[in-house]
């Protein structure tokens, strides 16, 4: 259910794009992200920092898209967000000796310390590559194709990555 909730702004963006076009869809994405954060704050009293980052990025890049009437900015938004995630993973590990992947998932699964480190690096690389793929699609395909990729392609890549990661991690998981 959380996965679908996380997709809420993307799904609304997709639907709004199909009905009204990129500029209305961009405004919808900004509002949907605000609503998502308000709901999380109301229900859980604590909003994940990455949701705040997402709101900041969608507001800045979406706002630029709307003010300048240029869809290039909203097309850069996923890449900037993916790269921000990648930088956060690497900087938290190198500068603060904190593994964010372990901090997020450590209560659900038990892994050797070295594997947590590898997992963090693999996620950072994945986000860099996904950002590059987003730019490739944004600059080489139509806006309609990019919007389809944003919902189906990027989400599909994430699902395949998580399944592959789960298979790889299964051999390291300690029995409880």
Curated annotation (Swiss-Prot):
Main location: membrane
Assigned keywords, A-Z: Cell inner membrane, Cell membrane, Membrane, Transmembrane, Transmembrane helix
Keyword Transmembrane helix included in the entry's annotation: yes
Keyword Acyltransferase: no
GO CC entries: plasma membrane
Membrane topology field: Multi-pass membrane protein
Pfam family, one: IspA
Transmembrane segments: 24-44, 49-69, 76-96, 119-139, 149-169
Protein family per UniProt: Belongs to the YciB family.
NCBIfam families reported in the protein's UniProt record: ispZ, PRK00259.1-3
Function, in words: Plays a role in cell envelope biogenesis, maintenance of cell envelope integrity and membrane homeostasis.
Name recorded for this polypeptide: Inner membrane-spanning protein YciB
Lineage of the species this protein comes from: Bacteria, Pseudomonadati, Pseudomonadota, Betaproteobacteria, Burkholderiales
